[in-house]
């Protein structure tokens, strides 16, 4: 297919249509917009180079852009068995929806504190899983356990009287992680005495 020169002056810079373009919709920066795109909600600036477009701002036929035209939905969660919570910019989350979401998250947090941690990876992870340095997948497990301990230390600083992760138990983890894993220390001690 041979390339041909396009007449850029008569083509809409948004939808690339060249049927409904006229000189009235030309932006001061010389970009053109078709009538269909002109009346749709958009900012009062050129969609290509962001030059201000004063003529459109004063035109009553053009619909004004507001934040309600484009909602950005964010999804939190992502854990198996937990519904995703949707929030949008500019909208407040009512208390009932928030409590509904929190009731699904609370068991995950409590499971962390109760040592019932479940990871979504192909290796079945148990906190008393052997940590031998010559097995490659235990190095991956070692990294996970170290990040758990770092996060547990943060929780202990924020929350008092957490039995599974008391400061005395966490001090044992410091000594444990400063040494390399060996066959002598092949299990991860988690329960407090």
UniProtKB/Swiss-Prot annotation:
Name the record gives this protein: Putative RING finger protein ORF38
Gene Ontology terms, MF aspect: zinc ion binding
PROSITE patterns: ZF_RING_1, ZF_RING_2
InterPro entries: Znf_RING, Znf_RING/FYVE/PHD, Znf_RING_CS
Family matches, as SUPFAM superfamilies: RING/U-box
UniProtKB keywords: Metal-binding, Zinc, Zinc-finger
Zinc finger map (RING-type): 12-50
Top-rank lineage group of the source organism: Viruses
């Amino acid at each position: 297919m041979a390339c041909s020169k396009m007449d850029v002056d008569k083509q809409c810079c948004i939808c690339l249509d060249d049927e409904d373009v006229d000189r009235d919709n030309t932006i001061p920066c010389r970009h053109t917009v078709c009538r269909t795109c002109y009346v749709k909600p958009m900012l009062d600036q050129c969609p290509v180079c962001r030059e201000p477009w004063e003529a459109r701002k004063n035109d009553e036929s053009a619909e004004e852009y507001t934040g309600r035209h484009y909602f950005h939905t964010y999804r939190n969660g992502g854990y198996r068995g937990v519904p995703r919570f949707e929030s949008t910019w500019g909208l407040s989350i009512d208390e009932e929806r928030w409590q509904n979401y929190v009731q699904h998250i609370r068991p995950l947090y409590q499971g962390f504190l109760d040592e019932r941690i479940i990871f979504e990876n192909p290796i079945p992870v148990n906190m008393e899983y052997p940590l031998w340095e010559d097995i490659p997948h235990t190095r991956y497990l070692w990294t996970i356990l170290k990040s758990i301990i770092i996060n547990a230390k943060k929780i202990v600083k924020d929350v008092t009287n957490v039995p599974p992760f008391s400061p005395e138990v966490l001090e044992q983890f410091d000594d444990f992680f400063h040494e390399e894993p060996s066959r002598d220390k092949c299990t991860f001690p988690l329960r407090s005495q």
